[in-house]
Every structure is written in C-alpha cells, then in structure tokens.
C-alpha cells in the first residue's frame, strides 16, 4: 500500500532528510512514440497522476520541480532502445507490435531525433 510506504519513509527520514520522486511529466509529453507505445505511455502516465495525488495527500510539505533535457539521438540508437525495451511502457508490448512500431518510427522520424524530455521531481523535506 502506497500510503503505508509513504508514512514509513516519512517516519524513517532523518532531520533535514529528503524524499525525491522522479517521473515523466504527465501532460504534453514529447517522447517520440509509435501508436501502441503512445497508448501504453498515456495509460502509465494516468496511473502516475493518481499516485501523485496520493503523495500530495500523504506528504503535506512537497515541492515540484521540472527538469528539461534537450535530447538529440540518432534514430538507429533510439530504435535499439525500443528493441531492448528500455522504456517501461514497452515491457508488455508484443514482439509483433514492437516490429510494427519500429517500422512506424523509421517512417515517421529523420536520422536524428530531437525532443524535449521533461522530468518532474517531487521533493519532501523533513
């Protein structure tokens, strides 16, 4: 149970200690995706949004910070990351959907892929 875990983490925290939680931003995500990947990513981000509400409810004094990273990657490297399922929303994607998705990425993007990757950091200080 997340409530129990947050309470335990908060109680175990030393004075001036911090809890940091990192996630992709849940809105306007710019990660290059194929259709099935986008669907899974949006589903995962909705779950994250619900978790953030629980975190906010349990940890009263939290702050939010966004970290923006300008990503430049070759399409070849990005496809390798997809094949290796480095992005968690790809873990449940079938091999067939992965192959079709890679074909979609090949058609959709240039040799160099550029996008803004934004991480949300939720921090709690004791």
Where are these regions (language model features)?
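Conserved class I S-adenosyl-L-methionine
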Residues: 18-48
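A short SAM/SAH-binding and catalytic strip from SAM-dependent methyltransferases
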Residues: 1-4, 25
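Short alpha-helix
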Residues: 44-59, 78, 100
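Phosphate/oxyanion-binding loops and surfaces in catalytic or ligand/nucleic-acid-binding neighborhoods
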Residues: 12, 58, 85
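A short glycine-rich, Lys/Arg-flanked "PGG" loop and its adjoining helix->strand segment in the class I
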Residues: 3-15
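Short conserved AdoMet
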Residues: 14, 56, 126
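Conserved Class I S-adenosyl-L-methionine
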Residues: 62-126
């Amino acid at each position: 149970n997340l409530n129990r875990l947050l309470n335990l983490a908060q109680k175990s925290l030393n004075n001036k200690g911090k809890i940091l939680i990192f996630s992709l931003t849940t809105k306007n995500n710019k990660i290059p995706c194929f259709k099935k990947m986008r669907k899974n990513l949006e589903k995962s981000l909705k779950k994250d949004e619900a978790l953030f509400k629980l975190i906010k409810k349990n940890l009263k004094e939290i702050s939010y910070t966004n970290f923006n990273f300008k990503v430049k990657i070759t399409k070849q490297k990005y496809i390798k990351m997809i094949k290796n399922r480095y992005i968690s929303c790809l873990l449940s994607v079938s091999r067939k959907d992965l192959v079709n998705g890679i074909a979609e990425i090949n058609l959709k993007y240039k040799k160099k892929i550029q996008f803004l990757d934004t991480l949300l950091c939720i921090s709690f200080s004791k």
